[in-house]
């Protein structure tokens, strides 16, 4: 059997870039909760003892940006300088202006346009991907890397591994078989975890705890064998982390946020953006389309692309590729997709309920992936029924 290796990585919520994603989305949540028509483009950067939020926000909401920054950092676990950032004593800088009136008139007519007439907030192309290799209809390498990161945070916060600190990264290499275009996982080839830790723990203790409390509960035993390679804190020391170790910036983890290197990516980040920004809403609707294609049995694996022009409601193009796994021709799948899904940004916002903030709705997306999550707030993960007739054998 001819197999190949493919690798996906993830970072957990204490990684400096992910910290920034979460702050940007916490700001978005706060704006949308009070004013669903908020126009938000919120960026965050962080370094030692400092967090800055900046961008363009037009909203009727009364938002305390500094309070949001400090709470988000505190909830992650950045409560002292020695873990990478002190949420209550760090400098918080705010540089927020209103959305450009040029963009406002072209996209939403200064809030006068009907939902179906709202134009895309910018040009761009977005991809949605789905594969039948996991129940989530997501790539196994990405699912495992993401879940390992989430587990690291869980055992840190519940005290199972008290030596853990907030920052950490994971990476999983899976051996696959290509079954006529569909991806079939055979085994896990390599597991890599690099996690921030305190001064008291030894490398042997780190390795033992990671295997017992993180890897064992997450990676199914059927994928592990005597040849599986484990790299557990291979650098030997990771005490300095968070924004103290590396500068952080919103939007630098776009592959981790999506499909772990599978499918494709148009380059636009998600966090801190309201649904008129098609980088986010466009990517969400094509994930729903791709997932629905696979869940309804039209294909075992597929990718869907959509593209936009600023100020124009209708997409410029929609594309479907089933990698040869389709039960009907791709052009017929495309026809079904176009008949079922409304790709206009204003309608995406309504159909996926993307103007609703609060309850950490978007903050939840900003760590451990935007796709493949079992959560009612992830409305784009709901499979839509697709009408098609299976060809006669």
From Swiss-Prot:
GO cellular component: cytoplasm
Organism lineage: Eukaryota, Viridiplantae, Streptophyta, Embryophyta, Tracheophyta
Protein family membership: Belongs to the AdoMet synthase family.
Entry's cofactor comment: Binds 2 divalent ions per subunit. The metal ions interact primarily with the substrate. Can utilize magnesium, manganese or cobalt (in vitro). Binds 1 potassium ion per subunit. The potassium ion interacts primarily with the substrate.
Record function comment: Catalyzes the formation of S-adenosylmethionine from methionine and ATP. The reaction comprises two steps that are both catalyzed by the same enzyme: formation of S-adenosylmethionine (AdoMet) and triphosphate, and subsequent hydrolysis of the triphosphate.
Catalytic activity reported: L-methionine + ATP + H2O = S-adenosyl-L-methionine + phosphate + diphosphate
Gene Ontology MF term list: ATP binding; metal ion binding; methionine adenosyltransferase activity
GO biological process: one-carbon metabolic process; S-adenosylmethionine biosynthetic process
Predominant location: cytoplasm
UniProt binding sites for ATP: 15, 167-169, 235-238, 246, 252-253, 269, 273, 277
Keyword Transmembrane carried by entry: no
Binding site residues for L-methionine: 56, 99, 246, 277
EC number(s) from the headed UniProt entry: 2.5.1.6
A Pfam family per the record: S-AdoMet_synt_M
The keyword Signal belongs to this UniProt entry's keyword annotation: no
Name of the gene: SAMS2
Subunit structure: Homotetramer.
Pathway terms, separated by semicolons: Amino-acid biosynthesis; S-adenosyl-L-methionine biosynthesis; S-adenosyl-L-methionine from L-methionine: step 1/1
Residues the entry annotates as binding Mg(2+): 9
EC class of the enzyme, as a word: transferase
Binding sites annotated in the UniProt record for K(+): 43
Organism this protein belongs to: Daucus carota
UniProt KW keywords: ATP-binding, Cobalt, Cytoplasm, Magnesium, Metal-binding, Nucleotide-binding, One-carbon metabolism, Potassium, Transferase
Protein name: S-adenosylmethionine synthase 2
